[in-house]
Curated annotation (Swiss-Prot):
Keyword Signal included in the entry's annotation: yes
Subcellular location: Periplasm
Official protein name in the record: Flagellar protein FlgA
Family according to the record: Belongs to the FlgA family.
InterPro entries given in the database record: Flag_basal_body_FlgA_C, Flagellar_FlgA, SAF
Signal peptide, first to last residue: 1-26
GO BP terms, alphabetized: bacterial-type flagellum assembly
Positions of transmembrane segments: none
Main localization of the protein described in the UniProt heading: periplasm
Alphabetical list of Gene3D superfamilies matching this protein: 2.30.30.760, Antifreeze-like/N-acetylneuraminic acid synthase C-terminal domain
Gene name in the database record: flgA
GO cellular component: periplasmic space
Keyword annotations: Bacterial flagellum biogenesis, Periplasm, Signal
Pfam families linked to this entry: ChapFlgA
């Protein structure tokens, strides 16, 4: 024998309300999440051209299937050099950018070689352009010998020991 009210209809209504609110929050969650942003050129950028903030704009990524590896912040592209043609409205792949060259092929650079407390300096001509940290081949102007070295941030070449 049971005394009291039959609460099954109240419980059912409460469960229905909870489920309805959970589903409505689940539907709102993607809308509340911030959409990813990407940088796109406002005009065609050709290979070898430096990228300035005026040449790009930030847009919302609406394609969920877009591949990763695109620039999303101006600091990622400002001052970088394009390695390929970048079309307006298309995302800018990070792999399509490189650091600006500190040494230019055919110009005169200072070669520096350290061994112990001794430092040797000479003039050389790089055989290719080089950015900070890249290894380039350089011809010593005085002897004609080819050496390899690392491009330093001051534009000199740190020659490697064999």
């Amino acid at each position: 024998m049971r005394f009291g009210r039959n609460n099954s209809s109240c419980r059912t209504a409460l469960v229905r309300m909870c489920l309805a609110s959970a589903f409505s929050l689940g539907a709102l969650a993607p809308a509340l999440a911030q959409a990813p942003m990407a940088l796109v050129p406002v005009r065609t950028i050709y290979p070898g051209e430096a990228i300035s903030p005026e040449q790009v704009k930030s847009v919302e990524v609406t394609n969920p299937n877009i591949s990763a590896g695109y620039a999303s912040d101006i600091s990622e592209v400002e001052g970088m050099i394009s390695k390929q043609t970048l079309l307006p409205g298309r995302t800018i792949p990070i792999a399509a950018l490189r650091e600006p060259s500190l040494v230019v092929r055919g110009t005169s650079v200072k070669l520096v070689f350290h061994i112990g407390n001794m430092t040797l300096m000479a003039s050389g001509t790089p055989m290719s352009d080089g950015s900070l940290g890249e290894v380039v081949r350089v011809r010593n102007i005085d002897s004609g010998v080819m050496v390899s070295g690392t491009v330093m941030k001051d534009g000199t070449i740190q020659v490697m020991a064999k």
